[in-house]
Each structure stands twice: as structure tokens, then as C-alpha cells.
């Protein structure tokens, strides 16, 4: 049986990390694509030269032509401009929308059967535009946001409670922006919901609120520290988890930006919700009950994404 083919559009910090992780996990052969000549070729060769040490078999190809992604099983899109200090994810809109148009055309021509994972910010608007530009079915095009946001939430909670990250489950809904909705009620430590842990005296509501805010600011915190770029290790790990669930038909329950068709009262928009990811892409969207406050926060997040999509239509009327 031939190996799977994983195409990475964009060979920056996230692209390079994705390529390395895909090799370490032996998910398949990797094509690194970038418009900058030499970068994908150099990174591909460097990672390939690490394979004898780490003991994995994968072929690495660097390319500057979309033809190289032909027949890819998974395409992960990181192309675009990253955030710089003081920039919001939304400031990137105009620049990265043009990139999505080119990427969408490349995927449509060479990898129409692929499962596509978008990482480019502003995430929810970019994955929405990418699906329209590529013409791929919506269940095969998703955005990576919720896995990362939930991972940040889980890490902060594990630090607060001094327990293993593996025993913390966390839930983040909504857009991948400052209005994301980390849900304490559906987040647990060894099955015990966070509100119960507050009652048990493990933490205070005030501390929990601060952790929720830190989760919202997670990306900006790293941008502020790095000064010349944005996060790449955790975003890459998150996208690889999604790709692995698809390639191995694991049917993991993962929060991703998926196209809603009426769930949560939302239509024709990509928003972060819990899904089941298997060999058919998004196989199920899980609609959980939200209380009044959670629903209000979720609706606010959706409104923020809707505003970005409207702005996209203003720039590229063909998206309407």
C-alpha cells in the first residue's frame, strides 16, 4: 500500500514543524510548498536528514509549484502573513484573503479529494473563504483553532491544579479570536467539572476567570514574547492531531472550525464546535446545550466571525 501524501502549503515556522511532526509520526510522505524558492527544499532536506537518527521513513519534497501537491490525501494550509505585536488576527484579513484565493485554486486543480486543514488567520474567515475558493465539500475543509485553544486551556488548568495535562479535558467554542468561548461547565479534571472543583476548594472562581482570559489571549501572549513571529509548535501539533484522526479514521472528538448548517442557530459559516473527525472528514457536529450566558457569549463570537466574512465579501465579491 502506498504511503499517504501530506501537502503543506506554506513552509514557515508552522509548516516546518508540521513537516517534522508528520515524519516523526510516520503519517506519510511530505510535500512542502512555498512561493519562496529554496525554503521548502532546504527545510525538507534538513528534516529528511534527521530521519535516520529518529528512525522514520518518509520522503520529503520541496516545491514552488502547486503541481507537486497533486493527489495529496491531506493538505494543511499555513500560507499567509503571521501576526506581529500589536496586530489583531483581523488586521491580516486583506493580505491573507488574496493568499487563500491562490491556495484554493491550487487545491481545486491538484488535490480535489484531499482533507484540508486551514491554520491561516483570521482563521474562521479564512477557512470559510478557502472552502468557497476551492469548491471542495464543506465536510472536507476545516479550520484548526479549537484543538489549540483547548490545549492552552488544558495546560493552564493543569498548572493551576498541579495535575497531568492528560487528566484535564477542556472545551473551547466559537471563533478563534478574542471572543472565543472557553466553557468551564464542560471542562473537567478526571471527569470532575470545573465548577465542582471551585466548590471543592481546588481553585477560586476569580482564578478560573483569569485562566479563561489567559486562554483567550494565548496567541497574543506568545506574539508579545517572541516579538518577531507567532506560535508554531502548539498550532502544528494541533493540526497534526486532526490530520491523524482523518488518515487513521480514529473518529476523535475534536473542536474544529466546521461549516454549520443550522446547528447552534448558525448557517453557512465556519465556527469552532465539537466534531467527530474520521475518514469522511467531519463526520458529525456535536450540538451541546448552552445556558443563557454561554449562548450569549457564543452568539457574540459568531457575530464577530460574521463581520469578518462580510469584510471578505467586500474585498472579494465572488465569495457571496
UniProtKB/Swiss-Prot annotation:
NAD(+) binds at residues 10-15, 34, 96, 119-121. Signal peptide: none annotated. The keyword NAD applies. It catalyses: (S)-malate + NAD(+) = oxaloacetate + NADH + H(+). It comes from the Bacteria. CDD domains: LDH-like_MDH (cd01339). The keyword Oxidoreductase applies. Pfam families: Ldh_1_C (PF02866), Ldh_1_N (PF00056). GO terms for biological process: lactate metabolic process; tricarboxylic acid cycle. Keywords: NAD, Oxidoreductase, Tricarboxylic acid cycle. Its EC number is 1.1.1.37. The active site is at residue 176. GO terms for molecular function: L-lactate dehydrogenase activity; L-malate dehydrogenase (NAD+) activity. Substrate binds at residues 83, 89, 121, 152. HAMAP family: Malate_dehydrog_3 (MF_00487). NCBIfam families: MalateDH_bact (TIGR01763), PRK06223.1 (NF004863). Catalyzes the reversible oxidation of malate to oxaloacetate. Belongs to the LDH/MDH superfamily. MDH type 3 family. This is Malate dehydrogenase. It comes from Brucella anthropi (strain ATCC 49188 / DSM 6882 / CCUG 24695 / JCM 21032 / LMG 3331 / NBRC 15819 / NCTC 12168 / Alc 37). The lineage of its organism: Bacteria, Pseudomonadati, Pseudomonadota, Alphaproteobacteria, Hyphomicrobiales.
